[in-house]
Amino acid sequence: MLAETFPEGNFVVLDEGRPVGMGLGILVEFDFAHTSHALVDITGENGVEHHSIDHPWYYGTDISVYPEYRSRGIGRRLYELRKDCVRRLGKRGIVAGGVIPGYADHIDTMSAQAYIDKVVAGELYDPTLTFQLENGFEARGVIPGYLDDPTVGNNSVLIVWENPDISS
């Protein structure tokens, strides 16, 4: 359904016909005054329920690269494709709930916000959030209850990339 609804905003990387990475998303309204949400609140039950080409924000619903294909520039290229889509369509930017897998090692010693702050400051490394920061995203706080992952207290981080071609 996603490929038919918003093909210009969804990307699959192939190696000899085999999918090895993907970046998926939809266009949404996003209320920055009320950022707490679960992914299904954004996508709806069918994954595209709240998508409209008229909405101003690209919401990154999923991005992944098979482990054996990591560190080859595929993830960076997927983010570039998303940014290119946003620029081409004249959208405000990209919003997503970013997973913070490294928080599992610190959950007993600090809050999710403290962990995010330390990653942003460069004091801790998170395999996902650090990569997102290196790709121009800002961390804008914790999203509690975003996903069902007790190892990180069901927390995620709100990440935002603002299109520099669009004035606020």
Whereabouts are the PLM-identified features?
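Conserved acyl-donor/pantetheine-binding loop and adjacent beta-alpha core of acyl/acetyltransferases
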Residues: G23-D62, E80, I100-L133, E138, ...
